[in-house]
Amino acid sequence: MENKFLTPKTVFIGGSGKTKRIGIGGHEPITIQTMWKEEIVNIYEDDVALNDLLNRIDNLQKLGCSILRFAVPDVKSALSLVKIAEHTSMPLVADIHFDYKLALECLKGNVAAIRINPGNIGSRDKVEAVVNACKEKGAAIRIGVNSGSLPKDLAQLVEQGKMTRAKALSETAIREVSVFNELNFDQVVVSMKASSVQETIDANETFASMYDIPLHVGVTEAGPLITGVVKSTLAFSKLINEGIGSTISVSLSSTPENEVITGREILHECGKRTGGVTIVSCPRCGRVGFDVHGFVDRWQNELLSLDKNITVAVMGCVVNGPGEGKHADIGIAGAGSKAIIFKKGEIEHHFETTTEAAQWLIDNKITKMTNRTIVRQEITSRI
């Protein structure tokens, strides 16, 4: 059956200074984005805070994040974002609302893209000023349309039941794209986000059937961890399997790390991401001899940041490990009050306590593979 959705063209972001150049759309891999959760207002004058932030950015990058967005509500935040961009290779996006001059300030540095909602940025001349600055800098723009900030006329139609919210989202995006076309600017990515899964799907399907502009897919205000993961999985899997979505961002009331991990797992299960560490772990039951939950919570991020195509099994008892975890490259399992380390189903080491086993696995496998000391040295030397 012929695909009714258009193949998106490629938009490039980054490439200036230390910033990586990344393609969005076309035949480029689907990228994962997230948004920084904290204010950055004082980063530009605090090297200690900057170093800590760069450390987090490095960790996000290792987990699979390709693009990072920051809220820029004031001039100090703009100055901070410019400084951050000097010290990281990850393309950074400035999230701008209301004051177009903040976008202009960010574009004085190596900020890779600007996210604006043209509906709240002001008059057309202000939009044009941002576009001209992006042209000069070689930066891209994401047109970000959310269900909570529709134009008044479309919002009224939705309230009156004369238009669906999904239709209003796509119509808003179409209007804004026409403005950018008139300004002869095509380095544009579009997002249409609702907190409803079906509205998000419908809006993106409508737009993708009409335009070859790359789509940034996300469910806005998706909620706490479990709710947000479910919503994002349903929306993303449907759209991605239809060929819609060139970059994704998961919105959770949780950490950026959890958002990135959720995104990478969705892409993996949709067949759009290969390689990397896979963690398999049992749900735990009355036979448990090992704190599965505690181990996974403590070491998940370090394991997933490894650039290795391996499976790690974390099992609570000998029923699940090594038997059910025999496909794993390395695994740990409880055995009553004792513990074992196994590889491809074969037991390699016995330990008198699960604490000893966990420490051996960390010291002899995880710690050596992460090279965390080297990472810290690299980060410290950058500022």
Where are these regions (language model features)?
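Active-site mouth loops of central-metabolism enzymes
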Residues: H27-D52, A71-P73, M90-F98, L154-S170, ...
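Catalytic alpha/beta core domains of metabolic enzymes, predominantly
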Residues: R142, N146, L154-S305, T311-V314
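Conserved, mostly hydrophobic/aromatic
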Residues: I32, D95, I143, V190, ...
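Glycine-rich, proline-tolerant flexible connector loops at the mouths of alpha/beta enzymes
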Residues: M35-V48, N59-A85, R115-S123, V188-V197
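Hydrophobic or amphipathic alpha-helical targeting/insertion segments
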Residues: K101-R142
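Alpha-helix-loop-beta-strand connector modules within alpha/beta enzyme cores
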Residues: V75-I96, A129-I141, N204-L215, W299-L303
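N-terminal active-site wall of soluble small-molecule enzyme domains
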Residues: L54-L60, R69-G109
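N-terminal amphipathic alpha-helix/helix-capping segment at the start of soluble metabolic enzymes
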Residues: M1-M35, E39-N42, N301
